[in-house]
């Protein structure tokens, strides 16, 4: 797992950089087409006054976030389409001539994308390159080297390679329904207050670890 360091845009610039609330349903990956590190990419993006924006930048050492995940960003070139309105933008650094640093940034990006998939219940089918939305030749280096399929495969491996406690529950349809009904009763009884837990159950992406924590929380609230 990679820590995502926040360096968020000032709310006074929301109208320019991220004007709309968003529930992420896709993840879009890009190449930066330069050789700056993640912090520099984010610092420049949040500091200027043009509309171009993205959520995170990933380099060989870290992941830096500039736009909140619950707000849209202008990174897909599809106007008010699904890419700009419903996808998290991930910029992969050092793609111009970064050598081994670039490939390490790619590895890190696969890990963080897998994390975001799990966090927001996004299926692998909804993880796409920038080119998917507007036809732009991006991520340029992956396209040049014909490696988008292998990058998607690395994301799958990162997603599936987590420890058992971080794996999504494997339940039958009736079991998911029963879990939703039972947790709904606990929520109505005030045993927990965050409805996002119910959303995760409804979307069938609750992990073993999360269920254990939730059960312990409900038990403790009954003492």
Where do the language-model regions lie?
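N-terminal catalytic cores of peptidoglycan-degrading enzymes
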Residues: 1-83
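Basic/polar, cationic surfaces and motifs that engage anionic cell-wall
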Residues: 1-21, 25, 93-166
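Extracytoplasmic/periplasmic, Sec-exported soluble proteins
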Residues: 19-21, 48, 82, 97-108, ...
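Structured segments of extracytoplasmic/periplasmic soluble domains
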Residues: 35, 44-48, 69, 112-120, ...
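Short, solvent-exposed alpha-helical surface patches in non-cytosolic proteins
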Residues: 163-223
């Amino acid at each position: 797992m990679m820590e995502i360091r926040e360096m968020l845009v000032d709310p006074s610039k929301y109208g320019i950089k991220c004007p709309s609330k968003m529930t992420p349903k896709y993840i879009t990956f890009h190449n930066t087409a330069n050789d700056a590190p993640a912090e520099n990419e984010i610092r420049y993006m949040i500091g200027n006054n043009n509309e171009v924006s993205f959520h995170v930048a990933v380099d060989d050492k870290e992941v830096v976030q500039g736009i909140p995940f619950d707000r849209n960003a202008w990174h897909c070139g599809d106007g008010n389409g699904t890419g700009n309105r419903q996808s998290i933008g991930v910029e992969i650094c050092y793609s111009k001539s970064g050598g081994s640093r670039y490939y390490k940034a790619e590895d890190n990006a696969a890990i963080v994308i897998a994390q975001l998939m799990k966090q927001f219940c996004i299926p692998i089918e909804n993880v796409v390159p920038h080119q998917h939305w507007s036809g732009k030749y991006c991520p340029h280096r992956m396209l040049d080297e014909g490696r988008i399929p292998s990058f998607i495969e690395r994301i799958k491996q990162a997603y599936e390679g987590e420890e058992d406690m971080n794996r999504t529950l494997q339940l039958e349809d009736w079991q998911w329904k029963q879990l939703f009904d039972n947790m709904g009763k606990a929520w109505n009884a005030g045993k927990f207050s965050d409805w996002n837990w119910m959303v995760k159950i409804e979307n069938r992406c609750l992990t073993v670890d999360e269920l254990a924590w939730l059960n312990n929380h409900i038990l403790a609230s009954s003492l």
